[in-house]
Amino acid sequence: MDDFFLDAGFTKDEQKAIVEAGRDERLLALVREAVEKRDQERFATLCKEGNTAHGPLFLLQALDACYPTTKKYYPDSEVRKATLSDISLWTRVYEKRHGVVGSDKCGWLAHHACGAIVRLGRLQFEDGTFPFNVTVRDAEGKTLCTQGTPVLRLHIPEGGPLLPALVDDSLLRAARWFSQYSFVTCDSWLLDPQLSLVAGTSSN
C-alpha cells in the first residue's frame, strides 16, 4: 500500500477499487498542475468533470495522483495523517449512502489536496476572512474585526466525541500553529441553539 492510501487511512479493498479503475491521464495531469498552483477552485472543477465522465472514483484517483505535491504541504507526518484521514471518512460516508466506493466532495477535499486545511487534534482549521456583515468592537469602541478581516476558520469534523478538553487542546495547538490570527470563526450547524431542544446533555 503506497503512502497516500496509508496516510489517508484507506483499507486494502478501497485502494484496490481506486487503483484498478480506468484512469484519465490527461485530466489527472491537469489536476496535478492545479495542486502545484494550490488552485482549489480549478482542482474542484476538474474533479467534478472527472466524476461526471468516469464515476465517483475519479476524485480519489486525483487525490492519489497529486499526493507527492500534497505531501510537501504537510511536512509534519502526524498532522498530515490526521488531516488526510478526512478523505477516507468521506469516502465511507459516500459508500454508506450509495453502496460503492467513491466520493463527490470535490470542493471540500480541494482544501486537503492543496494543503489549505489542517486537523490539529479534534478540530480542523484553515485561513479565511470574516464572512459576516458585522463589526466587532472592544469595550472602548475600537474596531477589532469587520467583514473581510483575516481570521482563522474552524471546522468540526465527523467522528468521536466533542469533549471540552479535546476542544481546548485543539485551540491551544491552533494558537501556536496560526499565531498571526486574533479571531477564530465557526459557523457549524452544531452551534445552532435549537439543538438543545432535541439533543441530550451528553451529545456533541
Label the predicted regions.
Residues 1-162, 177-183, 194-204:
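Non-catalytic substrate-recognition and accessory regions of acyl/acetyltransferase enzymes
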